[in-house]
From Swiss-Prot:
Catalytic activity, reaction form: 6-carboxyhexanoyl-[ACP] + L-alanine + H(+) = (8S)-8-amino-7-oxononanoate + holo-[ACP] + CO2
Gene that encodes it: bioF
GO MF term set: 8-amino-7-oxononanoate synthase activity; pyridoxal phosphate binding
Designated name of the protein: 8-amino-7-oxononanoate synthase
Known cofactor(s): pyridoxal 5'-phosphate
Pathway, per record: Cofactor biosynthesis; biotin biosynthesis
Annotated GO biological process: biotin biosynthetic process
InterPro entries, alphabetized: Aminotrans_II_pyridoxalP_BS (IPR001917), Aminotransferase_I/II_large (IPR004839), AON_synthase_class-II (IPR050087), AONS_Archaea/Proteobacteria (IPR004723), AONS_Proteobacteria (IPR022834), PyrdxlP-dep_Trfase (IPR015424), PyrdxlP-dep_Trfase_major (IPR015421), PyrdxlP-dep_Trfase_small (IPR015422)
Family matches, as SUPFAM superfamilies: PLP-dependent transferases
General function of this protein: Catalyzes the decarboxylative condensation of pimeloyl-[acyl-carrier protein] and L-alanine to produce 8-amino-7-oxononanoate (AON), [acyl-carrier protein], and carbon dioxide.
Assembly, per entry: Homodimer.
Domain of life of the source: Bacteria
Amino acid sequence: MTWQQRITTALEKRRATDAFRVRTVVEGGAGRFLIRDQCQFCNFSSNDYLGLSQHPAIVRAWQDGAERYGVGSGGSGHVSGYTTAHHALEESLADWLGYSRALLFISGFAANQALIAALMEKDDRIVADRLSHASLLEAANLSPAQLRRFAHNDASQLNTLLEKPCDGQQLVVTEGVFSMDGDSAPLGDVQATAQRHSAWLLVDDAHGIGVLGDEGRGSAFSQHVQPEVLVVTFGKGFGVSGAAVLCSDSVADYLLQFARHLIYSTSMPPAQAVALQAALKVIRSDDGEQRRQTLAALIQRFRAGVRDLPYQTTDSHSAIQPLIVGENSRALTLAEQLRERNMWVTAIRPPTVPAGTARLRLTLTAAHQTQDIDNVLEALYAAG
């Protein structure tokens, strides 16, 4: 099979199963509304959970940072790209989350890949929740370590897998809030199980940080857990982009030596770090708390409203509210029916989710209003 035949075959297979992905050009895709072809849609696909991407103080901070530092960092943090803005943000994050150190990464995907690649050796074992993010599972598959996956949120099966003989070290991997189902990991049980076997715990809290817990400290803090390694990302609750790894001094020093994604990547623009510092200030403020309360009320209203819909829901009390419809074609049809009513909802299909669990993945944000929730519920019942 030639290169072109291989590519053509793969694309034809995706099209035949209604799993072909396309991008849509829009304007204002992070806000309450987005524009496509001069039409306005109420946006239920954004991860901007607290509505901070449009926050005037954060926008101004990025502008001020660009005035001071320029628009790029100019290099890796190991060369010339580690500025006072980067250092200050790392210090603030570590203090906020109760860790010795924080290291900035350009994305959550890069952070997860770097961590697992740097930490794991061939005699080691990774035991990951079956629904962990693609960045974690891909990194685990590419690493020299053995990968075993436990049933979703099943600490008992996790214990069984950790009991099996292992010549090296064991790393337990999970998420704080799961990106496709929106439910939370029982981090207390998971950590206790890991500790019983001297395993380390890595938690990716991309969808919990900024949104859950006191001052938005996230899933681990709200469940009174401190994993050995915590990954937080800035494209959701923070409304910006990028990521950080929280860890001990020794792990941070180790990653600075061996995390190739960190060493060989241009660091995030200093202006972005300035904006993230401003976002953190908002998250920790009364404004941030009010946004979290607003979001929680909207989530409660939505969940109460979907009870009689003929779709499967999950045990999600987060901003991620999936409606599982089963077939790919059904999910696509529903998404299109909602867009005809000016509601922007995304259909999620395999391989992103397991076969037979295609869904509408609605995300709620503090920028939404009560009427938006009522409108999308009315549209869902009309389409149902």
